[in-house]
Amino acid sequence: MKHLFTALLMAWAIAIPTQAQDWLYTDEVQEAEPLNNIRYKGEMQASFSKGQTPLWLNANKHGLSSLDKTNGYMRVALERPLQTDSARRWGLGYALDVVAPLHYTSNVVVQQAYIEGRWLHGALTVGSKQWPMELKNNRLSSGSQTLGINARPVPQVRLALPNYWTLPFAGGWLQLKGHIAYGMMTDDNWQHDFTGYQNSYADRVLYHSKAGYLRIGRDEDMYPFSVEMGLEMACEFGGTPHVKLADGSMVEMPAGKGLSAFWHAFIPGGQDTSDGMYGNMEGNQLGSWVMRLNYNADTWRLGVYADHFFEDHSQMFLLDYNGYGTGEEWNVRKDRRFYVYQLKDIMLGTELNLKYGTWLKNVVFEYLFTKYQSGPYNHDRTSNIPDHMAGLDDYYNHGNYTGWQHWGQVIGNPLYRSPIYNDNGVIRVLNNRFVAFHLGFDGDLSSRLSYRVLATWQKGWGTYVEPFTKAHQNASFMVEGAYRFNPQWNVTAAYGMDFGSNQMLGHNAGLQITVSRTGLLKTKANKKGNKR
């Protein structure tokens, strides 16, 4: 793993002078105009539900949603896309996106506030930005398991090679992209309100993510088949975790500090104080192996993809060391023996794009299985029993931190039941062992009217630590129509439903209406650009 990310950094450095972009195809020196091409967006949304807001009216909106049966917001955003300077060797982008919500967990939401710069092919972003999912359809997929689009953006400093760069060997068949980021969670006040300081919470938690993707393929017109594969990893570390003990008392748990904590977030290592003699890894480490196969035909494009989630070595590498001695040597590595885990937990999906389709344009179908989690047993070596079995992975939860969530919404796939649904003040994912099937499709009914449909069936068993007394089921459905009056005005109406037990999502039905206006801000720089 160390070599993987060292290679990623080296490739990013090599990529800077060689990747083909617009500025490589022109000798013209573009005048710097940092105030041109500023786009605006004004948006109003209202949701009305019987029960809570249904799943697909709430999920995968970058956390800009509420479960309250009546909620809404007014939103104003200004953005200068980084792509504005694609003809220059350097680029500048920035945005401010502010929301005034009704019946949300905040009175004011700064959804996005960032500035980013590009020099040749490397990009540096500082602030909160909505990042899309990789290797999946952002409108139709149920969501990535690690770096999803379900929670509010985390303010961060992010260094990236955002677009695939062709490596200068292998005949142009290999391309690479990736990122490294550090930031800080912003939901301290929400955690205080939600738990009432009576259950576990964590303040000033630091965030780290990294990802690297390799694509094998060439010009799709000549070579229609391509493969994409990658590793996504994230970590919550530092801060001040407050943990509720078995006797009901609250204790402040020491966490890693300083440069060593940042290093252990980047290269998993160290250990938490609570690990005791059985050192694990410092912080909440997690990630996914991802892969996608693509075939590009004349009239259609097909993608088949996989997303394998892990919380530790047992699912990251599907093996763990199990060669400890006995007696006085119970904690000494004696033999080359390993415990092999099964590859059961996985997300499998397929995406079909009809290039000239109208009524039907894109179809996504996904299958998720998360029941295994390295098995129902977790045992560390002792003087009597030397076997080491690292089961009970408890996806999205953690002993010291409040799990893979931000502002109550899971950061990954929303089929893991987000803590915001809990009514007991506990910030935990209470259903992370499930099987699910998901279908999404969209199309255009006319040149102005488009639609989108999402449908999901899920069967859950709770968690290993707190299992349901029996398996529970849930079905969620959404149909959405969008009408564009002109290039500036758009109206969207969506109807969603949930059918399930209270341990899942319950019975909900709701209507969501969104009105938006977009355009180009009238500035002197924009007027000058339009005259060219």
Describe the predicted segments one by one.
Residues 22-74, 85-96, 178-182:
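Transmembrane beta-strand segments of Gram-negative outer membrane beta-barrel proteins
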Residues 44-52, 80-82, 96-102, 119-121, ...:
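Transmembrane beta-strands of outer-membrane beta-barrel pores
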Residues 24-40, 81-93, 118-122, 164-178, ...:
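Short loop/turn motifs that connect adjacent beta-strands in outer-membrane beta-barrel proteins
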Residues 132-253:
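Internal, well-ordered domain-core segments that constitute the primary functional module
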Residues 1-24, 515, 532:
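Bacterial Sec-dependent N-terminal signal peptides
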Residues 4, 223-231, 241-532:
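Exposed, low-structure sequence patches enriched in small/polar residues
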Residues 39-43, 69-77, 108-112, 154-158, ...:
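Transmembrane beta-barrel architecture of outer-membrane proteins
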Residues 87-117, 131-150:
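Surface-exposed loop and membrane-interface regions of Gram-negative outer-membrane beta-barrel proteins
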